């Protein structure tokens, strides 16, 4: 079925409606097909377009050509010898969990190693049961007490901050005898980042352990513990992107004298097998990205398929969430191009039109859009239809109202920023964040991910989003703050809207350093709220982890600047060892 418009820009637009329906469906009235999603292809023959001054961000070309991605190879596969060996190793490691039943410290160390090696998802039920039952003696040392505290909070269990009181003197300060206990101090430091508001002892623990670890570093001999201390002081364990931590910790664990060879082999094999899943997903995504046509049609936007996949992998790395990662990557790829359209390329009147058209959610709205926006508009509708259809088919859950609302809210937030820029308006810090936590796309990404985590009904999904709002909000705010710290200078140079740092500088009349310190303070504040919400939250740990992991991924991507816009360097290196290079 074809619909032909006569465009106001003297172009002819052909829209072909493609029904994704069972083979036996026959042509008939459109109402007969209302239960199936509509997919659209676009062919535009434009005679001319209105000449407008267009800005450019001058993004470098992709360093990951989609055709090269399709050539990724690995000898690892779940079939045959590797799959059989994986199962055998899982059985061996599972038996280890029962070996230490009378040694709580041994159990806790094993669980911690499993988590940091990236294999704990195989033993989730066993780990939860152990953590629910394990109790420490009153004379347990600093290392074990802090490790126990951290693991319980990470898994959503309630544990009091008072467990650290025994390590303080009568004057309330941590004992001098702890100052040489480097493993205990590192464990205390890691635990302190699971603190909540009002837990002053954990703030004191953070200050004390930080000071002592820095002092010990000055006298260290460069061993493996020293390396871990440097790593912790650079990025706290609780803030690290999981998959990068897994790769790094495998290298650390194999150098430890007390490592378990079966667990080490499992970690390496599992890492390589999961990497093979990532490569399969990326090959599918590379074909989709080429077919989408953004690379040829939208020269102003970032071509960053691999880097966008890093976001998805960071949010949810386990192999059985493959479909979630694929849809998240598609979402982020389209979002990035739409973001560039609002930030850089589109004129304000065009952006007003696009936002209005998206509210209508109707392919007929294409007639009023300039040619370059048509492909963006249809990409959103096609993607949403594909996702909604898949979730409806697999889960029986109808998500279109939620998905549509997220896209509309996102573009409305983009439009607010475009209006600010075009009018020369500088918002206050609070006014900026009120809009920017939405425009960063975190809320929208989590809603898309949640649609693929499995729900029993539309009401269940709605309640999920309602009761998880605080987690979604604070994790999205953290993404925005990390983004601004890493990208604000580059975005200001290319003429983008002011970011939180500039808003605070102008509003308060302070230096850039003071503004950045304020943002860093807000990041610490937000993490404390997240810690509390992740324990209070009665929703699935998969949902909680997606929220936390999105924040961790943002910290990773923007740690050294704009890891997406300028992805040559650290981002490239990380993608190579996460996706391309197996562990030998």
From Swiss-Prot:
Molecular functions (GO terms): magnesium ion binding; terpene synthase activity
Motif window: DDXXD motif: 339-343
Residues the entry annotates as binding Mg(2+) 3: 491
GO terms, biological process: diterpenoid biosynthetic process; hydrocarbon biosynthetic process
Keywords tagged on the record: Lyase, Magnesium, Metal-binding
Gene3D superfamilies hit by this protein: Farnesyl Diphosphate Synthase, Terpene synthase, N-terminal domain
Binding-site residues, Mg(2+) 1: 339, 343
Cofactor: record remark: Binds 3 Mg(2+) ions per subunit.
Written domain comment of the UniProt record: The Asp-Asp-Xaa-Xaa-Asp/Glu (DDXXD/E) motif is important for the catalytic activity, presumably through binding to Mg(2+).
Family: Belongs to the terpene synthase family.
Further remarks about this protein from its record: Does not produce any detectable product when tested in vitro.
Functional note: Probable sesquiterpene synthase.
Name assigned to this protein: Probable terpene synthase 9
Organism name: Ricinus communis (Castor bean)
Gene this chain is encoded by: TPS9
């Amino acid at each position: 079925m074809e619909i032909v418009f006569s465009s106001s820009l003297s172009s002819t637009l052909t829209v072909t409606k493609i029904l994704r329906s069972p083979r036996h469906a026959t042509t008939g009235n459109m109402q007969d097909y209302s239960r199936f999603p509509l997919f659209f292809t676009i062919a535009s023959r434009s005679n001319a377009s209105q000449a407008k001054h267009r800005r450019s961000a001058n993004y470098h070309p992709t360093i990951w050509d989609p055709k090269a991605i399709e050539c990724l190879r690995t000898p690892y596969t779940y079939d045959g010898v590797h799959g059989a060996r994986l199962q055998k190793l899982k059985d061996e490691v599972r038996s280890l969990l029962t070996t230490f039943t009378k040694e709580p410290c041994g159990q806790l160390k094993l669980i911690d190693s499993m988590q940091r090696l990236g294999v704990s998802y195989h033993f989730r039920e066993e780990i939860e049961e152990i953590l629910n039952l394990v109790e420490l003696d009153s004379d347990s040392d600093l290392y074990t007490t802090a490790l126990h505290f951290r693991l319980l909070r990470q898994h959503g269990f309630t544990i009091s901050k008072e467990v650290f009181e025994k390590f303080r003197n009568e004057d309330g300060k941590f004992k001098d005898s702890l100052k040489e206990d480097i493993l205990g101090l590192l464990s205390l430091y890691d635990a302190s980042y699971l603190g909540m508001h009002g837990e002053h002892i954990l703030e004191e623990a953070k200050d004390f352990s930080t000071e002592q670890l820095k002092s010990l570093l000055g006298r260290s001999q460069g061993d493996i513990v020293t390396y871990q201390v440097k790593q912790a002081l650079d990025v706290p364990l609780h803030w690290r992107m999981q998959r990068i931590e897994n790769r790094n910790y495998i290298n650390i664990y194999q150098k430890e004298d007390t490592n378990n060879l079966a667990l080490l082999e499992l970690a390496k094999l599992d890492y390589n097998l999961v990497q093979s899943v990532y490569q399969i997903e990326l090959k599918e995504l590379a074909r989709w990205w080429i077919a989408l046509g953004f690379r040829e049609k939208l020269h102003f936007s970032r071509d960053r398929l691999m880097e966008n996949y890093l976001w998805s992998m960071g949010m949810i790395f386990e192999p059985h969430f493959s479909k979630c990662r694929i849809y998240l990557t598609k979402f982020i790829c389209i979002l990035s191009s739409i973001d560039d359209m609002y930030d850089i390329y589109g004129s304000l009147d065009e952006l007003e039109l696009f936002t209005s058209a998206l509210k209508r959610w109707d392919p007929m709205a294409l007639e009023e859009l300039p040619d370059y926006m048509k492909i963006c508009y249809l990409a959103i509708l096609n993607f949403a239809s594909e996702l909604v259809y898949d979730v409806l088919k697999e889960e029986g859950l109808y998500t279109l109202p939620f998905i549509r609302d997220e896209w509309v809210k996102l573009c409305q937030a983009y439009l607010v920023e475009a209006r600010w820029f075009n009018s020369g308006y500088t918002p206050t810090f609070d006014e900026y964040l009120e809009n920017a936590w939405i425009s960063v796309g975190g809320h929208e990404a989590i809603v898309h991910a949640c649609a693929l985590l499995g729900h029993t009904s539309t009401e269940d999904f709605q309640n999920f989003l309602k009761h998880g709002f605080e987690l979604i909000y604070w994790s999205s705010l953290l993404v925005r703050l990390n983004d601004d710290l890493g990208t604000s200078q580059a975005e200001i140079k290319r003429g983008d809207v002011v970011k939180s740092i500039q808003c605070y500088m102008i509003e308060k009349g302070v230096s850039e350093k003071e503004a950045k310190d304020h943002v860093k303070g807000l990041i610490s504040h937000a993490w404390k709220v997240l810690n509390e919400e992740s324990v209070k939250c009665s929703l699935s740990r998969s949902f909680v982890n997606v929220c936390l992991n999105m924040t961790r991924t943002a910290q990773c991507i923007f740690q050294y600047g704009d890891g997406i816009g300028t992805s040559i360097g650290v981002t490239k290196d990380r993608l190579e060892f996460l996706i391309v290079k197996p562990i030998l």
